[in-house]
Amino acid sequence: MSGGSVAFVNLGCRVNRVELDDIAARLEAAGLVPTAPAAADAIVVNSCAVTGEAEAKTRKTVRRMATLAQAPEVIVTGCVASLFASELSGLAPNVTVEADKSLVAGRVISLVGQGGGVPSACEGVTPTGRTRPAIKIQDGCDNRCSYCIVWKARGRGRSLPAVEVLSRLDETCGRGAREVVLTGINIGRYRDGGLDLAGLLDLVMARSDVGRVRIGSIEPPDVTERLVDAMARHGGRVAPFLHVCLQSGSDATLRRMCRAYDTAAYRQVVAYARDRLPKLSLGTDLIVGFPGETEGEFEESLAFCEEMAFSRMHVFRYSRRPGTPAATAPRQVDPREMARRSRRMRELARRMRRSEAERMVGSEQLVLVERAGRGVTGGLFDLHLDPSVPVGSLVRACVRSVLDDASLLGRLS
């Protein structure tokens, strides 16, 4: 059977996007051309099971892809595929489930054949058009947070050997990447023998000429002094940004979540990081409406977030994830109340982001140009600049002003 084109649909986290990029690269090497779902012979869906809503979205997406006019082969992978393979397979006759992502490219080729096309030109380093590619250095999680099922879907924590990290980094830089993100499900637990994440960062800096490295989302206990000191040692070559997952700013809620820290520990981590990294921008994830969250606990969480002065917050309303302790916990919060709390938290997030953006006016920023006239700073702020600056380049720019959406206006230094 002759092959042709393949489309990619990602649902969920950054790690899913990285895994989909790897699959796309293998299929492009086999001659299958990336295209839009409506024109594809095969569609790869990388699924997410982090919440009940995410799982429902996966099922809806698979059904929609399977019923497109050209009746494509739909190959589903990811966390929902690991947990509910038989249910996904039964959605349509042209749906194939492959939980093992290393086998997905082979499955696609077996269904539609190898292609002979020439990849279409697109901006970006990866076949899916991304300019800031990531390397998955770790997978799995050994935590047992009461709202999460990822540990079941992903398995126990395991790390990519450092030599393989360096090999992938060289390959990625060889494709033109100027910034690379180190990511994983729980990257702070990276271990290769005696090498931890701080040691890996030192090794990457010593063995690679990559322009900038960014550390992906990390748990508070893993933001060690060793890691922060390593970031400080390498200056601008490590993005001055940490996404430190909080989930709640109330100690009572954190205990019910079975998180491995309290607000005092979180505060201490942030204080040390800001002392050693004066230009640090701080991001986080935050859940509102967790079972049992009282109005007082929500107010505590709101106040703590304001104290931390996050520049980037992902605010989620709690969504029941069947199979987790939280799903059957007492005192589930009314959805209307969750929506109200979410609005208040998101408004705080907007105010804090704008405040951080205004603080950057007059500063010089290292900017990765992601598309014509638009780049991203080390602190993950969009910056508008001269559209003639080449896409993919890493340049220095002076911040002139803040726009209405809290993006920045700059000019080359």
Give the role of each language-model region.
Residues 184, 217, 246-248, 284-288, ...:
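Active-site proximal loops enriched in glycine and acidic residues that flank catalytic Cys/His/Asp
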Residues 244, 285, 305, 313, ...:
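Hydrophobic, well-ordered secondary-structure elements that form the walls
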Residues 143, 188, 251-252, 373, ...:
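Glycine-centered loop/turn positions within well-structured domains
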Residues 151, 254-257, 325-329:
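Short acidic, glycine/proline-rich loop/turn micro-motifs
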